[in-house]
Amino acid sequence: MEQELQWLLTQRIPKVVLQAQNSLLGISLLGHKTGPNGHTSRGTSTDSHIHLHDTKTGEDVGEVTVSGAAVTHLSLLLPVSASTQPMRRTTTRLKMDEALPLRQAQEALSFIKSATKKTRLMPRLDSSETALDYVENMLSDVKRARQILTVGSQLELMPLQSDSTEKFAPALPENLVIECKFKEGSIVVHLYFLKFRRGVKSSGGILDAFKKDTAAGHMLVHNGRLAEVKQELVFQAPLGSMASDLDSLDQAASLLIDVVGQLHAFDSM
């Protein structure tokens, strides 16, 4: 039994850690590349131009450009009530330096970097307890990164402003806010048309501090003030690079889970 444990500590685990490292180094999260030193760098081609589809109708409703960990451009078919036509294609750009940070990507990258760093800094594995603590910590980083990229939790709402090339393009309503996030290997764009309640005045400005109040249903809250979601549009498109990155995380997790199981078997003896 002691011989098997020594084989696990001196041969099996180092080999698995190297394989997990290779899987992590294969991740190019939306143009980011994790190097052997645990730092991320950007490749020469990082922009992803993706066609968005309405999740209800399946219609092509525009494009989104994802550059690194941010959305830098949106071209959407939006309903504008002031127009004689029910739908008008309006090119929009985001406020806040005309880019919307994809905080999921940023947060997931921090865990990927942490896991990659752990693969390079293997401690002296002189017991099953030491090895288990080391591998489980690495596995926790990998699982957390994958969870962040697939859950699609509420992140950040921001206002839009029109950048249309049309001569008589209608202005975007002030009560329109947008949210971009990842969910199950796709980029998802939510558009919310708000109606302010409890005497709240027209937005007129910054709405980026809004957060979804799931307990209140289709309500948004800002500094204790409520706004009702009068209309919600959901546009979505698959991200091929994201699917590949999730596969790489799954590969790393599978390798580490196998080792954790072997180490637990020794602890139970």
Question: What kind of feature is each model-predicted range?
Answer:
Residues 1-136:
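N-terminal intrinsically disordered, low-complexity regulatory tails that precede a folded domain
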Residues 120-269:
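Extended, alpha-helical interaction "stalks"
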